Structure formats: C-alpha cells, structure tokens
Amino acid sequence: DGSVEVRDRARGIPVDIDAIEAIAKKHNLKVIYDSAQAHMAEYNGKGIGAFGDACTYSFYATKNLGTGEGGMVTVNNADLAIGFLRSHGETDKYLHESIGFNYRMNDITGAIGLSKLETLKPETNRRRAVADIYASRIDAIDGVHRPVPTKGSNPAWHLYTCRVDLDALTCTRDEFCAALNKEGVPTAVHY
C-alpha cells in the first residue's frame, strides 16, 4: 500500500483522472489530487473533488477562490486520517497517535471565502467563456500553442498559458507580450 499525489491540475485543467485511478487501483495506491488552481473544474460531469481519496485546494490570494491564505481538503475515503491533522494528531482526549499541525483558518479568511463562494460559479463561467474566445483566435496564429483540455474535462481556467514558438513569430517574446498587453490581454512569464 502507498499513496501518490497528483500535482497536475496546473492552471485549472484536470488531468486524465481515469488513467490515474486505473494505475492507482492496479497498484493499490491512495490518490491525493492537488487542485490548488482548479476550483470548480470538472471531469466527466463531476466536480474534481469527487475523485481520488482526497483533494486539496488552495485559498491563497491569487487563486480563483482567494481568501488571503488557507486551504481545504475534501476526503472520499473514510479511512483517511485527515482528522488527525486537524486535531493535532489527537484521537482521544490527551492521546496523540501521530504528529499533528494547526492549519485552521481564522474566522476572517473563512468569512471572505464564504462571501466569495457567491461569485465563484459566475466568475468560473466568465473564465470559460474568455478561454473559448482565446482558443478560437489563437488557433489562427502560427507559432502560438494554446492549452488543450483533457478529454472529458471542463477546466476552471486559473490561468490561460500558451507556449510561443519565437522562431515562427517576427518579434521577440517581450514585443509579443507588449502587443497583447496593449490590446487588453494581460501577459506574464510564469514558472
């Protein structure tokens, strides 16, 4: 028995969950999905938190559901001991069976998160609409390669990251980014 953490939901695009879960089942692995950038992303019509043994989300200020700091773990496996971490490893009063940590969010960041839940779905739908526009227009540009979502996925589009083949363009990367910024499309070099 073991576990595997899947950290490939970068930019809000779900991975091929069917393939990962098949491998996990074959090797008797627990799967923990890192969905820090994938709030509201879906795979085969289900929210991504429905898959694996656990799913983690980040509420850092730059995320789609940012509260300043904090996060959340959803669990699909009753045997998974998330409660140990929440309660400092305490299973019974004064009985600690594992090392625990205090990662509780404070009331203020919790209230910010609850208030932002009201706008998360419409904001995600807006991101999806913008991503569709980007996809239709980027496909016509030689040398610019857009992200292609995994079959069956409905991304949350935390970021829309393109790969640019500078040899195919007649400008530098900085000139390309400046032209996009001038048109109201913010750009940045990440990672």
What are these regions (language model features)?
Residues 6-8, 13-20, 26, 42, ...:
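PLP-dependent aminotransferase class I/II
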